Design a protein with these regions (language model features):
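Glycine-rich phosphate-binding loop at the start of an alpha helix
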Residues: 35-40, 145, 257, 261
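Short acidic/glycine-enriched loop/turn segments that link adjacent beta-strands
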Residues: 85-88
């Protein structure tokens, strides 16, 4: 059983046909579905055959219940605390090459407190995946630290995804590097931009440092594993798919390079379609 702590939100993904301009009116492909980095990781893990548990916080609203039912139907166990704030939502605007711009509202999950969660939710895990988004804002950050402590005491590996170059820039690269030094994750996933914003060698942050290179593949221990050649439709959730596949393979006994080879295939599938989930 793998687990993650963080967001379960509604993704509204918009792919305009052509360049948007102010006061313009364009046709677009629009997809509405579940998202959130922690939720996506769990959804992809379940699709790959892993038991998966998501710990999150949603509003006391119809949207929250619908998102929980949707991800549970995909095989994910959900431990959700209810919040007076509305369930989170993210608008994703896609560019012509699959690049993304986000507008987000996630106050519900950011308010998840240590006293809201039960330690039992983090026991019995083989791996706990922590998006850096879950470390950027209190009280969620303190809750994530508690989760790491409990999961590790039960024998779980810890993986961290650095989540966002802009988020690291706002939070502070040196501050996040210190956080990683204290958390001591076994695995760290980062894009090139995220690794640069961190400002510290990723190799010193974890036993297995993984740098995602986009269309050029992935780098592990300085060795590059090439990406599969596919047309990028929507990269939303592709990093979560990659991390889920890497962790699944690694837990099954694959070497880091073997795990990366499997993960790039799943990541390629993820970018070839709209939406963040399998």
């Amino acid at each position: 059983m793998v687990g993650s702590i963080g967001s379960l939100v509604l993704d509204v993904t918009i792919a305009p046909e052509g360049q948007l301009r102010l006061d313009d009116d364009r046709d677009a492909s629009i997809r509405i579905g579940g998202g959130g980095q922690a939720a996506n990781f769990c959804a992809w893990s379940a699709a790959l055959g892993e038991g998966a548990r998501l710990v999150t916080r949603v509003g006391r609203d119809e949207l929250g219940e619908r998102l929980i039912a949707e991800i549970e139907a995909g095989g994910v166990e959900v431990r959700a605390v209810r919040s007076p704030e509305p369930t989170g939502a993210i608008a994703v605007l896609l560019g012509p090459g699959g690049e993304r711009t986000f507008a987000r509202q996630e106050r519900a999950v950011f308010g998840l407190r240590p006293e809201d969660v039960e330690e039992e939710w983090f026991r019995g895990l083989t791996l706990l995946h922590v998006p850096a988004y879950s470390l950027f804002v209190e009280p969620l950050a303190s809750t994530a630290r508690k989760a790491v402590e409990v999961a590790r005491a039960g024998g779980a590996l810890i993986s961290v995804d650095l989540s966002s170059a802009a988020g690291i820039r706002e939070y502070g690269g040196a501050r996040l590097a210190l956080e990683l030094a204290l958390l001591r994750p076994e695995l760290v996933f980062a894009s090139e931009a995220e690794a640069e914003e961190l400002g510290a060698p990723l190799e010193g942050m974890a036993k297995v440092p993984v740098v995602k290179l986009g269309t050029r593949g992935v780098r592990v221990y300085g060795r590059r594993v090439p990406a599969s050649r596919v047309e990028t439709v929507d990269a939303t959730g592709a990093g979560d798919a990659f991390a889920a596949a890497f962790c699944s393979a690694y837990l099954d006994g694959a070497t880091p390079l073997e795990a990366a080879g499997r993960a790039v295939l799943v990541g390629a599938f993820a970018v070839s379609r709209m939406g963040a989930r399998p």
